[in-house]
Curated annotation (Swiss-Prot):
It is found in: Mitochondrion inner membrane. A ubiquinone binds at residue 201. It is a multi-pass membrane protein. GO terms for biological process: mitochondrial electron transport, ubiquinol to cytochrome c. Heme 1 (or BL or b562) is low-potential and absorbs at about 562 nm, and heme 2 (or BH or b566) is high-potential and absorbs at about 566 nm. Disulfide bonds: none annotated. This is Cytochrome b. Component of the ubiquinol-cytochrome c reductase complex (complex III or cytochrome b-c1 complex) that is part of the mitochondrial respiratory chain. The b-c1 complex mediates electron transfer from ubiquinol to cytochrome c. Contributes to the generation of a proton gradient across the mitochondrial membrane that is then used for ATP synthesis. Its cofactor is heme b. It comes from Kobus ellipsiprymnus. Keywords: Electron transport, Heme, Iron, Membrane, Metal-binding, Mitochondrion, Mitochondrion inner membrane, Respiratory chain, Transmembrane, Transmembrane helix, Transport, Ubiquinone. Heme b b562 binds at residues 83, 182.
Amino acid sequence: MTNVQKTHPLMKIVNNAFIDLPAPSNISSWWNFGSLLGICLVLQILTGLFLAMHYTSDTTTAFSSVTHICRDVNYGWIIRYMHANGASMFFICLFMHVGRGLYYGSYIFLETWNIGVVLLFTTMATAFMGYVLPWGQMSFWGATVITNLLSAIPYIGTNLVEWIWGGFSVDKATLTRFFAFHFILPFIIAAITMVHLLFLHETGSNNPTGISSDMDKIPFHPYYTIKDILGALLLILVLMLLVLFAPDLLGDPDNYAPANPLNTPLTIKPEWYFLFAYAILRSIPNKLGGVLALVLSILILVLMPLLHTSKQRSMMFRPISQCLFWILVADLLTLTWIGGQPVEHPYIIIGQLASIMYFLLILVLMPTASTIGNNLLEW
């Protein structure tokens, strides 16, 4: 009798990717975040689909349609808050996933890493457009401020912004197109994720030691399927704690006021997961300079393979690099805090120092520490 699992064209793909996949025997819980991101994506697509059934992308009715979802639709409130807080969980998993890649040298897999950076940018674009849809005060002003940054591009900037707006300000046309893009992008993300996995399965997973694990592989199922299920349960636990006990903890109170172009909020800020980049943007007094720093703060990830000077792949046995890595994490937390503060003393100078530190750590200090580590081991 033939094994359908190994002969059927579709089942064969599933089998080779999730069942009989040879995986390193020593990958830790830091390797759980890939599957958690997949779960987050599916959850966001499903909750988003049900929200889209009741949402209207018109400036006059968008805000009230979200209110209608929360008040009148059966379990609409839980779908709405699962979607909003699901985005936060998505980004927590994303940051952990990228951090794991940086710490253990996963960026040596060039194709997988670069596709991952593309995924990060796409997810950030999707989340930004999603934040505009409820058409609250922070939605409107966030959209105005962030899209306006494109006007810093020489020659074509102003035309580009008006083209994206579909007029001379953020208005009905902007909201409609943002809804269209916000709906389609998660499916594009899912497609790019398939390519991400395709490239990963060409090389196999990295592991904490950073050395080849070809001589010590175990099947993905049941060992890592059960481990991923545990991770998924913990993710859903944290998400439901947020949704049911503190649904507005990570949101902005200003977004409960309908968008008003005549009234500017005291501090305009994006969602918490963009605050680190927003702080870097604000720390530079020049508009174009700020925009470049903002883009580079994420795009710098592409340079990681070039900045890898160590003879070892992972940071597991590199204490100096480890210290700098955790300083970088602390620096990003500082930037996140600063991004949510008003532009005044002492926040301005703290933000500027943290921004300088961010680029200094990645571009100078960490490669230098790796070289020192090589010399200490007389390599």
